[in-house]
Amino acid sequence: MLVLGACGDDSGSASQGEASGGRAAPLSLTLTESGCDPTSLSAPAGDVKFAVTNTSGLKGEFEIISATPEILTEEFLDDGASGTFTVPLKAGQYQVICGAPSNTRADLVISGEGEAAPEVKVDQGELDAAVSSYQGFVLQQTEDLAASTKSFTDAVRAGDMAKAKQLYAQVRVPWEQIEPVAELFPDSDAVIDSRADDFPKAEEDPNFTGFHALEYGLFAGGSVDMPSLADRLDSDIQNLITQVKSLEIQPQVMTNGAAALIEEAAQTKITGEEERYSGTDLVTLQANVDGANKVFVLVSPLLATTNEQLDDDLAAQFRKVQQTLDGYKTADGFEPYGQVSEADRAKLKTSMAELSELLSQVTGSLGLQVNQ
């Protein structure tokens, strides 16, 4: 887990120097209302230390992305959260996203050789086949998302609130299942799946679009009169399909993304923050678990040859998480999240955190590069 925070820097750029005793001083970065401060960062290759604080007044997302693009680290920060973290980076050019993807980003230049990345330990042909299968899965899920969402948005446009509310949770499942790689298309993520917390005016902000804006109107606002939001969602998902068709997913993106998704679920989604208006969080959590499990199933035969114990532990941990979720299944889905006891929420949080920790070991166990 990456723990974030610390103080900002008033200058336009920052470099990693040395602290007392020869230790590398962390790069200081502030998440402001408009984005990153400073907007230019540099450090030598290797374990790069960061110190970040969020003063934006909103819950914010912090990410480092490579030119691939590949998400190298991401974290959600409450306003005022602080801390330090370290991430291994090879020489190259990166970008830092502070808050919304449209905010001012920071350019990060990593120079020098640094520590060499590990060699792939598994059969390259089998690894390529697993990645190809996953890429096909992501495209199929995205196309399924477009079709199912069209039924939902048609109900909104027709003014059929009962049908729209009935369809809402299930049409989101394909999206939630591909979230291990959703940050490869951050602009689509921002317009399809953003929360009201991401915007200065919350639910009343004109830039609040996507599933959760429609969820708010249906379940909290008591209105189905949202044809423009419905049209925008259909259009944004079509744009997503175009992006997915041209993606080349790297294996470490799959494995790191699965771990990051379950970590996010354990830290934030478990609180009920995502589906706060509809109470359909168990559907979302199940889809996230299924999405991470898809990655695991594809790499499991390879993992069994390099770290059989980890492979066994992951299979057992997925079963453990599923057992808790199964306790709240109904004939047509899941009980509302408000029905989940505090004890079971705590159990889910713990078991999903343990699952995330195990998943975070897969990339290294397969001998994959942490970043490219």
Protein language model annotation of sequence segments:
Residues 39-58, 83-99:
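Beta-strand cores of secreted/periplasmic/IMS beta-sandwich domains, seen most often
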Residues 69-75:
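Surface-exposed loop/edge segments in extracytoplasmic proteins
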Residues 61-65:
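Beta-strand signatures of extracellular beta-sandwich domains
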Residues 22-44, 147:
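N-terminal edge beta-strand
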